[in-house]
């Protein structure tokens, strides 16, 4: 099973690439990759786009870096680039999203059985990350690019299985300074981040 981190955006609301923001001395991308490896994802890929050279330094050794040369194509172009050659189910993680709980990842793995995709739902609302079957990942990687294509639309049309989780973090992102502050505050209090 593979994990794919999408980190190709401009980070226009932040001064630096979101993946390079430091959390307790380590870049956020580094922490995300290490967490995913600890959850049994033998292969972790990071898709870079804008600020790729600087962001690549924040990725730990042993993680495959993929450059999305079609940066203007947006997040879906990054997704397609990262999925090429995938050999099994793929967990799609956004660089500006909180990490899910280990229990959420486990439930997504169970929920993928017999489905094209599984996505977490907290209090009736969908969130991240999404787990794609090998068939869906291959179809997305080989699809013709449309500038209006979005993963949530693909998941809906594929009939993604919605998995109820007790993990508020699946709805959280880290787009604004306040979002980072909340994340760091939860870490400092040593509260489980997913209970938020």
Role assignments for model-derived ranges:
Residues 54-55, 107, 139, 173, ...:
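Phosphate- and divalent-cation-binding pockets in alpha/beta enzyme and binding domains
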């Amino acid at each position: 099973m593979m994990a794919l981190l999408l980190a190709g955006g401009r980070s226009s609301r932040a001064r630096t690439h979101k993946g390079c923001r430091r959390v307790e001395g380590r870049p956020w991308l580094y922490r995300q990759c290490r967490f995913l490896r600890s959850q049994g994802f033998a292969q972790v890929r990071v898709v870079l786009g804008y600020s790729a050279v600087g962001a690549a330094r924040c990725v730990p050794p042993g993680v495959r870096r993929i450059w999305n040369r079609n940066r203007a194509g947006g997040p879906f172009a990054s997704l397609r680039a990262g999925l090429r050659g995938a050999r099994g189910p793929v967990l799609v993680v956004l660089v500006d999203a909180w990490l899910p709980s280990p229990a959420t990842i486990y439930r997504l793995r169970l929920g993928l059985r017999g489905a094209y995709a599984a996505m977490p739902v907290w209090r009736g609302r969908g969130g991240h990350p999404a787990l794609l079957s090998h068939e869906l990942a291959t179809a997305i990687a080989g699809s013709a690019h449309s500038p209006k294509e979005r993963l949530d639309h693909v998941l809906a049309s594929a009939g993604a299985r919605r998995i109820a989780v007790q993990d508020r973090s699946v709805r959280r992102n880290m787009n604004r300074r306040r979002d980072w502050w909340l994340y760091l505050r939860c870490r400092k209090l040593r509260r489980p981040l997913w209970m938020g």
